[in-house]
Amino acid sequence: MLPDRILPAETARERALLATAELWRKVGYEGLTAAAICSRAGIEAEEFEAACGDVEAAAKAAIEVPLAAVVRVVSELYSPDRSEAESYALAIVRILELMAANPAYTFLVYVAGRQMAPPRVHAVYHSGHQFLVAMLERLWASSQLRDQPTRTGLAALGAAEAVVRREILAGRYERLPGLAPDFVYGAMSPFLGQREALRLADLGRRQLQREPAN
């Protein structure tokens, strides 16, 4: 695990959101209470109310934490010195490292927020999912493939998410970064073809071998 991939939990709000994620993972959404969140976060009820409002607002904000981190990763790794696909390949590595370092938040995004959340909270998961699909679909702009079927991004992302959920439910968070080369290949090949996808998968593999990853 890379320490700099751990999301911060220093302010009262950050501690409350991490506590929300950890408790949600442990007891489910229906088991969340403001008192339990405050106890786990080490904050007073007044601090929780000022920082988060109520339990549903805290749950919504907790899912937004890792999604915002993903957006930051994609933005940080964009560079005019490399192709969009290369930036995406590096982003996949970084995102998987983030997921491994933040298991409670990862569980929310890939399991709880998808299946066990009220509509307002589930909508956050859906918006994050749509962002990733749209990101992949942008690869068509640089594709040389003649056949460009619809919903390709959705299919590619769905396949990767199924593998991620399997590893999460088995408690194998530490294995997630090692999946990066396969995920890069699976995400890129429908858009860019096998040869380019293999090159990008190798880029992801080489990035994984760097300590720390950039």
Language-model segments: which ranges?
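Helix-turn-helix
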Residues: 23-61
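Hydrophobic alpha-helical connector segments
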Residues: 57, 61, 72-104
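C-terminal peripheral helix-coil segments that are non-catalytic and often amphipathic
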Residues: 1, 134, 138, 169-214
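Amphipathic alpha-helical segments that line or abut small-molecule/effector binding pockets
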Residues: 18, 85-100, 154, 158, ...
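Amphipathic alpha-helical segments used for helix-helix packing
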Residues: 87, 99-119, 133-137, 165
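Generic hydrophobic, amphipathic alpha-helix propensity
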Residues: 9-20, 37, 58, 62-70
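Amphipathic alpha-helical packing segments from all-alpha helical-bundle domains
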Residues: 118-142, 150-162, 177-185
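Short, structured motif recognition centered on aromatic/hydrophobic residues
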Residues: 70-71, 108-109, 160
